[in-house]
């Protein structure tokens, strides 16, 4: 039995978002053993319970108020939202923030030897998918009628098996499509993981914990997107050097022992530092350039 005084978070037990979700919670300082087969794991250092479930179940658990938070792909969330609306329900939830993992796209794909001149080419065709509501919404907007073939897995084999003329499925690299004689022809939905919260009144202690968790998540994401940079640079070219490195704040400038014309510069850059940027820094006279990852960050 779940304790209602503890914050309940649902994550995917196994699959595309599972490892990244667990890593995010760990980097937020939540100490929990997620290597067992138990469906409910209790945090050691916070009043938090983690429910490990199928990703399809997470939106419903949040919308029905069974859990307080859920980490889920936007594609699964939107499909469940459309499904419930089609049944006359009025599902409610709050999207707290988009996360920095789980990126994918839901796309239409057809056999490589078939011509494609837009969605109209699918009029009257049979399309295999695990996302019937997202597919219907998209093709309804295009004025295309079709027959849906609902599959919960191995969607890409449907055309070869004679089950469908085309498919609508998640794509990351496109290698699976190519292996099955298909080509991606149209992206209908782009998705990333997101953090959602149940609608309705929340106990103050839980809300304070959610606010703390959001601050930590923001810090984790900022840290992943930032780098700590150290270098020696000529004093007269500091502004040119800084212009190459967009940062959260102005850099720290320190004198160099025995050097009158050069200084040490430390800063956090909010953009990826490419080799081309480092070469430009060197051309401006910078030396001893170090680029380091950041584990945690709070502004």
Curated annotation (Swiss-Prot):
Cellular location of this protein? Cytoplasm
The protein's gene is named: hisG
Q: Which GO terms describe its molecular function?
A: ATP binding; ATP phosphoribosyltransferase activity; magnesium ion binding
Induction section of the entry:
Repressed by ppGpp in the presence of histidine.
Q: SUPFAM superfamilies attached here? A: GlnB-like, Periplasmic binding protein-like II
Superkingdom: Bacteria
Keyword annotations? Amino-acid biosynthesis, ATP-binding, Cytoplasm, Glycosyltransferase, Histidine biosynthesis, Magnesium, Metal-binding, Nucleotide-binding, Transferase
UniProt record similarity statement: Belongs to the ATP phosphoribosyltransferase family. Long subfamily.
Entry cofactors: Mg(2+)
Recorded protein name is ATP phosphoribosyltransferase
Which EC numbers does the record give? 2.4.2.17
Q: Which Pfam families match?
A: HisG, HisG_C
Q: How is its activity regulated?
A: Feedback inhibited by histidine. Also inhibited by AMP and ADP.
Major localization class: cytoplasm
Record flagged with keyword Magnesium: yes
Under catalytic activity, the entry for this protein gives:
1-(5-phospho-beta-D-ribosyl)-ATP + diphosphate = 5-phospho-alpha-D-ribose 1-diphosphate + ATP
Biological pathway: Amino-acid biosynthesis; L-histidine biosynthesis; L-histidine from 5-phospho-alpha-D-ribose 1-diphosphate: step 1/9
């Amino acid at each position: 039995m779940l304790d209602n005084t503890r914050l309940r978070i649902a994550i995917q037990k196994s699959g595309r978002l599972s490892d990244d979700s667990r890593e995010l919670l760990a980097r937020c300082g939540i100490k929990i053993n997620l290597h067992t087969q138990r469906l409910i794991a209790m945090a050691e250092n916070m009043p938090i319970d983690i429910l490990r479930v199928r990703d399809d179940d997470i939106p419903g658990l949040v919308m029905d108020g069974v859990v307080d938070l859920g980490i889920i792909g936007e594609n699964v969330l939107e499909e469940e939202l459309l499904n419930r609306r089609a049944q006359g329900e009025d599902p409610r939830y709050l999207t707290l923030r988009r996360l920095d993992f789980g990126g994918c796209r839901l796309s239409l794909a057809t056999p490589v030897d078939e011509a494609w001149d837009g969605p109209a080419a699918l009029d009257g065709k049979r399309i295999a998918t695990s996302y019937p509501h997202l597919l219907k919404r998209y093709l309804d907007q295009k004025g295309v009628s079709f027959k849906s073939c609902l599959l919960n897995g191995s969607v890409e084999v449907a055309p070869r098996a004679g089950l469908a003329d085309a498919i609508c499925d998640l794509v990351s690299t496109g290698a699976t499509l190519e292996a099955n004689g298909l080509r991606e022809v149209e992206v209908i939905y782009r998705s990333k993981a997101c953090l959602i919260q149940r609608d309705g009144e929340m106990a103050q202690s839980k809300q304070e914990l959610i606010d703390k968790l959001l601050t930590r998540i923001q810090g984790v994401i900022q840290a992943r997107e930032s780098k700590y940079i150290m270098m020696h640079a000529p004093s007269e070219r500091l502004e040119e050097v800084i212009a190459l490195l967009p940062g959260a704040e102005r850099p720290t400038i320190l004198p160099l022992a025995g050097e009158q014309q050069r200084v040490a510069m430390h800063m956090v850059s909010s953009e990826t530092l490419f080799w081309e940027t480092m070469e430009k820094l060197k051309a401006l006279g910078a030396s001893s350039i170090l680029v380091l990852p950041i584990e945690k960050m709070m502004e």
